[in-house]
Amino acid sequence: AEEKERRRDSLAEKLKIWRQEKEHEKMWTEKEKEYRKRAITSLVRLNGLSEFMEQIDAKSIPKVAVTNAPRENAEMMLKALELDIWFKDLVVLGGECEHAKPHPQPYIDGMRLLGLDPIEDAKDCIVFEDSPSGATAAVAAGCYVCGVLTSQKAEHLEEVGVHMIVKDFQEFSGRFYSC
């Protein structure tokens, strides 16, 4: 009788945990759905981004988008900002890598996706990052990192070792092409 009661208690505990996990999953799904609904109407391209993308396309410079956003969010953002035309299948999602940012793995995977050697070619890659987590990953991958001021303060990006900070792509192009 004791063994039967212990198994019943164990099963009840497992069911309780399972219900909590399902409820958490449901809440997460709803939160992400609400995020996408709000974000799609408020996303705005940074100044100079379209011109910058056209310039690197004209020079046949390979590019890849690397993000920690869940797939649905990443696809929505790229489409809403009309960046999907430039990246197509060239997107690395941190959540689908062995390690997500701030680990360098997503950037290493991005370089490999472009046919680059992460050890030999990282120094020739430029990464635009607006988060300390992403900048940390890119610096650790050995890339040249340009911090973009969207929601973070410059000092937060400087602390993790970015090489340059700009407010948008127009400023980057002005500084880069004047060299």
What are these regions (language model features)?
Residues 1, 13, 20, 38-41, ...:
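Generic anion/oxyanion-binding catalytic loop in active/binding sites
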Residues 1-21, 26-28, 33-38:
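Alpha-helical substrate-recognition element adjacent to the catalytic core
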Residues 4, 45, 103:
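Conserved donor sugar-nucleotide recognition element shared by glycan-biosynthetic enzymes
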Residues 21, 37-65, 71-75, 124:
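Short, acidic loop-to-helix structural element flanking the phosphoryl-transfer center
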Residues 50, 54, 71-179:
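Asp-based, Mg2+/Mn2+-dependent phosphohydrolase catalytic module
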